[in-house]
Regions:
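Helix-coil boundary/capping segments in enzymes
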Residues: 1-111
Length: 111
């Protein structure tokens, strides 16, 4: 079941695909780069076919269903969740604010 209604179409499409087995399911993996996002505030572009929301639950599900032994991930973000106001040079700190909020959600055990 999709975590967000906006993700229904792509999640139904993905569910039709045949899963590929992990080649080395016991090999510990550090995913060197992942993003988190919530695109619902932006107009949907007809050429894009993506999950509109991809946060804790979505990445956790992807990792859990992958068959791989992902032990850590590295969060990377660029140009998203900037602060709406304040000094221009500090607006990018909104990305850090955002990921701290996501980490707090994760620690709460509810997300």
């Amino acid at each position: 079941m999709p975590s967000y209604p906006e993700n229904v179409d792509i999640e139904q499409w993905i569910a039709k695909e045949t899963p590929e087995p992990a080649l080395e399911p016991n090999l510990p993996i550090i995913d060197p780069h992942h993003h988190l996002w919530d695109q619902r505030q932006f107009p949907k572009r007809p050429e894009s076919f993506r999950q509109e929301v991809y946060l804790c639950e979505e990445i956790s599900n992807d990792i859990g269903e992958s068959g791989h032994n992902v032990v850590q991930t590295v969060f990377a973000q660029c140009g998203a969740f900037y602060r709406a106001d304040g000094p221009e040079e500090m607006r990018c700190v909104g990305e850090t604010d955002f990921v701290h909020g996501v980490a707090a959600m994760s620690r709460a055990g509810l997300y």
